[in-house]
Amino acid sequence: MIQVLLVTLCLAAFPYQGSSIILESGNVNDYEVVYPRKVTPVPRGAVQPKYEDAMQYEFKVNGEPVVLHLEKNKGLFSEDYSETHYSPDGREITTYPLVEDHCYYHGRIENDADSTASISACNGLKGHFKLQGEMYLIEPLELSDSEAHAVYKYENVEKEDEAPKMCGVTQNWESYEPIKKAFQLNLTPEQQGFPQRYVELVIVADHRMNTKYNGDSDKIRQWVHQIVNTINEIYRPLNIRFALVGLEIWSNQDLITVTSVSHDTLASFGNWRETDLLRRQRHDNAQLLTAIDFDGDTVGLAYVGGMCQLKHSTGVIQDHSAINLLVALTMAHELGHNLGMNHDGNQCHCGANSCVMPSVLSDQPSKLFSDCSKKDYQTFLPVNNPQCILNKPLRTDTASTPVSGNELLEA
């Protein structure tokens, strides 16, 4: 009995390293099993919410202890956030989730100034963090021990498809004047000339997405929430906040013709947004998330400079990877087009091997905007004057997962 107890204690104290495992993100060639320990202090007598505004976790990476600091992404959901799906006979059903705790966080690693993190704490810790310049993924292991998590480098995930992933936007590059040195300095977004802007966002998951996730709306919901949480992290340096005001799942059938021709699908989706969605859902921008395989290497398409326009404030995104970060980066890229950003040319730099806006999406994920993207956005604001992103959305510190039954409202 004593020997068994000692073994259990050792497993909890020291990470286990494995050579290969199949995880949600795919086949992983090298990983560690870790046991994150929550170390957030709670004042004596205080009522502890399920998901605090700030949390800290300790665990080991490569044998070295790390402390992950997390802060809740307040304002991730608007106060009037809604979800819509369709009954088998085609009736539109909209729910308004109760306003309570949510479990999506941004964060950093202690003593690493360049670290970042985007984490879901809904069921264990799931997401990604940057540590000492390398991207790591973390997710709970489906073991009897509910505290066990896998941590692994992004580069150790076997790629499902070696073909390059591309944006379908075509653009003629312009030569840019040298960017002011303010972009290289440790200045606030306001000091760099980025006024606070708010984008009220609707995500639509098409019928193929519903089929891909076996009609499990919870999985689709969590997948989308993680995407938008990461998008907020990416756009924080530009002082842009994305508030999710609606999630619509085409659970019965597609409401437009979704084809492998991305330009046709984008045009149809833009028309549908103008004639249907805008009539019943207040929002600034809509993105279609589809499980169709677009022709060629295209995984996304959007209208350049279309933000706040009735038809053109849209994009279409292929759900092309089992790694949530990669799909989030694709959507962040297409939203960049909506905000006036062109593709990066060779003269564009962000201090990393790749940036957010290349025409060919890099196999080294980057959440940094180039100097060119920053200038494009700064030019877009006064020239296009997008009024819809000026207003602060109805926001709340927290939001919940949907409830059923008496919260169903037929439109």
From Swiss-Prot:
One of its GO terms (biological process) is proteolysis. The keyword Repeat does not apply. The keyword Metal-binding applies. Binds 1 zinc ion per subunit. GO terms for cellular component: extracellular region; plasma membrane. It is found in: Secreted. Its cofactor is Zn(2+). Transmembrane segments: none annotated. Its EC number is 3.4.24.-. Residues 197-393 form the Peptidase M12B domain. Ca(2+) 1 binds at residues 200, 284, 388, 391. Its main location: secreted. Residues 21-189 form a propeptide. Expressed by the venom gland. GO terms for molecular function: metal ion binding; metalloendopeptidase activity; toxin activity. Disulfide bonds join 308-388, 348-372, 350-355. Zn(2+) binds at residues 333, 337, 343. Ca(2+) 2 binds at residues 403, 406, 408, 410. Keywords: Calcium, Disulfide bond, Fibrinolytic toxin, Hemostasis impairing toxin, Hydrolase, Metal-binding, Metalloprotease, Protease, Secreted, Signal, Toxin, Zinc, Zymogen. Monomer. Belongs to the venom metalloproteinase (M12B) family. P-I subfamily. This is Snake venom metalloproteinase ACLF. It comes from Agkistrodon contortrix laticinctus (Broad-banded copperhead).
